[in-house]
Amino acid sequence: LAGHETTANAMTWTWYLLSQHPAAEAKLHAELDSVLDGRVPAIGDIPQLKFTEAVLAEAMRLYPPAWAIGRNVVDEHDFGGFVAKPGTLILTSPFVMHRDARFWEAPLEFRPERWETTSVKEATNRNIYFPFGGGIRRCIGESFAWTEGILLIATIARKWKLSLAPDQRICLNPQITLRPKFGMRMKIHARKAWIEKA
């Protein structure tokens, strides 16, 4: 997320998912109204923005910006009967792992609430959630990316609601990052709660 394209993709898929799940969007707005009371969010608010963090975690579970991660084998290794020789390129895919029913209940559903019982750290330690990669080559900007993502969502959602343009086609375009093939046109609406405070 720390790079501009990964951040843009994470936010794009987050707004798309929120536009399709009004109950989650309402819960996000309720948290922001309670914690922020109309003001601009600050870093000190992040510990209280638990559902906002859960929305971001769940969006990156379903649509990880880095959908495939490659590693070159240094030493011969047996992967359950498949022997990888030095120099072999191994690809892991957060996109595939994050949708695996062996590890996730209702894996194709957008359920930010799942992060109320499973922490990002726990899922990362179990190697079932890795939108930032893993091991010693894990994304150096991960901490910044979480801060940036949570604050972006909170800043926009405290005032605005986004809805998908009626004719918007949704199709994945997995290149280096996972982006929407036809862009993501959305309509922006001022939230009633914000208008009443203004």
PLM feature spans:
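Conserved cytochrome P450 K-helix/beta-meander segment immediately N-terminal to the heme-binding cysteine loop
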Residues: T92-K121, K197
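Flexible loop/turn segments at secondary-structure boundaries
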Residues: I69, H77, H98-D100, T118-S119, ...
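Cytochrome P450 proximal C-terminal region
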Residues: D33-P41, R138, S143-A198
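Cytochrome P450 I-helix active-site segment
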Residues: Y16-A66, V73, G80-L89, E105-R111, ...
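Extracellular trypsin-like serine protease catalytic domains
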Residues: Y129-F132
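Cytochrome P450 catalytic-core helices
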Residues: T6-E31, E142-W160
